[in-house]
């Protein structure tokens, strides 16, 4: 299995491609195992070759474990994404000048896998031509460690940048929240002052209302007293008028009596005194 096929099934995360990923991984492991067995059988001729084969076996197993871990990590990271959409999205993101954290992680893992595949291809071609030798394996292991370290530093720098961006956003949000809190506290003080003013106004209105009620009661009392006084005076005037009317009636009666007595002829008795009827 070549490098392009390995990268192809890493980027394609559909159900069929995941099955193909498992089968290709098993085939790759079998190929490594068979190649390792053949190389071990060939190198058993000398003690130096045997030591180199054992070192190569350990290194191959460690590298295989690293690749399996990377494959499992990539399957969890890029699961549920269409590879064609992922490629098109990554192109669009690079044109715009930025990409999502998920795509950055995928690109980082892809870079690591490419380095691993290149190392294995270089190792296999070199050993097929020149045979096993300890010193190139040692150099390759150092290069692998250096590349892993560089990839980790790259991912660390990306995480550091993301952390700085998140910290900056959090600080801005914290400032906004502090401003809102200060505004709410100021508004609360204003409302408390307004409440005190309303309490004072309410107390003033209550006092005014009590005074008005008191004045109203006094007015009603005074009015009733005035009405009583008016009634008394009215009764007195009525009685006085009636007395005057009676006096006038008596006078009229006397006058009438005098007129009637004058209208009749007077008669005298034997003594010459008028006779009254």
Curated annotation (Swiss-Prot):
<feature type="region of interest" description="Disordered">
    <location>
        <begin position="33"/>
        <end position="168"/>
    </location>
</feature>
<feature type="compositionally biased region" description="Basic and acidic residues">
    <location>
        <begin position="242"/>
        <end position="258"/>
    </location>
</feature>
<feature type="compositionally biased region" description="Basic residues">
    <location>
        <begin position="231"/>
        <end position="241"/>
    </location>
</feature>
<feature type="compositionally biased region" description="Polar residues">
    <location>
        <begin position="259"/>
        <end position="271"/>
    </location>
</feature>
<feature type="compositionally biased region" description="Basic and acidic residues">
    <location>
        <begin position="216"/>
        <end position="230"/>
    </location>
</feature>
<feature type="compositionally biased region" description="Basic and acidic residues">
    <location>
        <begin position="100"/>
        <end position="113"/>
    </location>
</feature>
<dbReference type="GO" id="GO:0000956">
    <property type="term" value="P:nuclear-transcribed mRNA catabolic process"/>
</dbReference>
<keyword id="KW-0963">Cytoplasm</keyword>
<feature type="region of interest" description="Disordered">
    <location>
        <begin position="210"/>
        <end position="277"/>
    </location>
</feature>
<feature type="compositionally biased region" description="Basic and acidic residues">
    <location>
        <begin position="34"/>
        <end position="45"/>
    </location>
</feature>
<feature type="compositionally biased region" description="Basic and acidic residues">
    <location>
        <begin position="151"/>
        <end position="168"/>
    </location>
</feature>
<dbReference type="GO" id="GO:0005737">
    <property type="term" value="C:cytoplasm"/>
</dbReference>
<feature type="compositionally biased region" description="Basic residues">
    <location>
        <begin position="86"/>
        <end position="99"/>
    </location>
</feature>
<protein>
    <recommendedName>
        <fullName>Uncharacterized protein YKL023W</fullName>
    </recommendedName>
</protein>
